[in-house]
């Protein structure tokens, strides 16, 4: 990613911030932008995701599908940044993550997800939706991680 742009920065639909008089809060969209920032100046890495598709009905009552997981990866020396989205609002995605030609030595996860997919930050509850750390297991040369339903996840993988 060379540049990301958002037109409505403050007090609009999908904005990063909300402000009113002397109050200022960040939205979940801010956290997503922050989670994708580590890709900056990285070497793009091809990713392949295999997960069951998410079936849904559009507002015009026509059926449609989304990939069960989607994301991107970038390499910074021996550190691989993987960001992914699980669009299913009901199903977690148990995964095995492989780095072709490398061994995953250590891993950390940052997760943005809430049980209520309608949760939002407000002036009354500014920290309702926050990023959280999650466990990533190492199994041999690979990593094991469960993507929660309706989540955006940043994995930092140390390669050896």
Language-model regions, residue ranges each:
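Aromatic/acidic polysaccharide-binding cleft in carbohydrate-active enzymes
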Residues: 1-70
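C-terminal beta-sandwich/jelly-roll accessory domains of carbohydrate-active enzymes
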Residues: 52-66, 80, 85-160
């Amino acid at each position: 990613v060379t540049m990301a742009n958002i037109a409505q920065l403050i007090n609009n639909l999908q904005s990063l911030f909300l402000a009113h008089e002397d109050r200022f809060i960040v939205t979940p969209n801010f956290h997503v932008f922050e989670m994708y920032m580590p890709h900056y100046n990285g070497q793009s890495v091809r990713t392949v995701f295999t997960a069951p598709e998410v079936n849904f009905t559009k507002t015009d009552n026509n059926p449609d599908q989304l990939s069960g997981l989607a994301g991107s990866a970038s390499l910074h020396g021996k550190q691989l940044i993987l960001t992914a989205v699980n669009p299913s609002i009901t199903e977690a995605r148990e995964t095995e993550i492989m780095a072709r030609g490398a061994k995953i030595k250590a891993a950390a996860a940052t997760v943005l997800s809430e049980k209520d997919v309608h949760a939002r930050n407000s002036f009354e509850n500014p920290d309702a939706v926050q990023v959280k750390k999650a466990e990533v297991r190492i199994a041999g040369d690979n990593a094991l991680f469960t993507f929660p339903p309706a989540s955006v996840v940043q994995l930092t993988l140390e390669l050896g």
